[in-house]
Structures are given as C-alpha cells and as structure tokens.
Design a protein with these regions (language model features):
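Conserved SAM/SAH-binding loop
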Residues: 2-10
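Glycine-rich phosphate/adenylate-binding loop
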Residues: 14-168
Length: 168
C-alpha cells in the first residue's frame, strides 16, 4: 500500500513494475488523471489493474477492471467518453456551495467497493476467462435500483493497447 501524494512529475514505473496487480483508489488530483497515468504504465508492463469508483460523481460506479490487451484500456474509455459526451452540457446545479452541502450515501460507496472486491478476486484467482467474460464499467442507478453497463469496446487502433498481445 502506498500512501503518498502523487504529483504530475512523480515517477511511478518502479512502483508498478514490481507488482502483480494494481488497485487505483486515488481521486486526487483527479481520478481521470491518476487513472490515465497509472493505467498507461500498467499496460506497458502487462499488469492487470482496477480503477475504483465509489466517490464524488463516481459514487455508484463499479469502476473498471483493465487487463492489458484483453479489456478496453483507460484510453479506450477516454475515447468512449469523448464520443458519448461530445454534445453534453452540464446543467446548473441547484446547490451553490456544493463542497459544503452535498454528501454521498455510504451505501453507494459500499456497493462500489464490494463490487470491485468481487471483480478483483475473480481476476486474481482466475475464476473466469477474462478473454471471454469481463464486465466494463457499470453504474448503479439509485432511483430505480438498476445496474447499467457502458458500451465501451476495445479499440484495435488504440495508441495504448491496440495491436498488443496478451500473455497468460
């Protein structure tokens, strides 16, 4: 477990290449940044990793299990969101000082962490064939208690994972 702050210039290759699996729960300075930085190094060294959800706008997100050259990578997800959110404009939020006013439901973070644990155990223990059965990121919708999954696909032309081979 590493409990240090990460800055843009922080060198992480030596930390990552010496492990078998990485769980990224860093949400500072921003989850998108930490996910991209860590995931690119993990893919380079063919290290499976999990980008956790369960906080802020990702409160009920399942997170992403990324197995290099098998599942969509962080860049595949970024491209997906760029396409899907191309014309999206945020609505003005009714609460002005959100950092003081808005909290989250603990049960949603519990959902995200429990889901992540199950997916991580399945991957590490080899309980499912990830070449055939893996789940992309999902969202638990509290209003109707449903679980929906994104339609992210591995991009064969991805600059990070496209064209690479996975070794079991």
């Amino acid at each position: 477990i590493i409990q240090e702050s990460m800055k843009p210039e922080t060198k992480i290759e030596n930390l990552i290449k010496s492990v078998d699996f990485v769980v990224n729960t860093m949400d500072e300075p921003y989850i998108g940044y930490t996910a991209a930085k860590i995931s690119r190094v993990c893919v380079k060294y063919k290290i499976a990793h999990y980008i956790a959800g369960g906080f802020d706008a990702h409160l009920s997100s399942t997170g992403e299990l990324i197995v290099p050259y098998v599942t969509p990578c962080v860049e595949c997800y970024a491209s997906h969101f760029k396409r899907k959110l191309k014309d999206w404009k945020p609505k003005k939020h009714p609460v002005k000082s959100r950092y003081k006013e808005i909290g989250g439901l603990a049960c949603l973070s519990l959902f995200s962490s429990s889901y992540a644990c199950i997916e991580i155990i399945k991957c590490i223990a080899g309980l499912v064939d990830l070449e055939d059965k893996y789940k992309v990121r999902g969202e638990f919708l509290f209003n109707d208690m449903s679980l929906t999954y994104l339609d992210v696909e591995k991009n064969p032309n991805c600059p990070i994972c496209g064209g690479g081979l996975h070794e079991s």
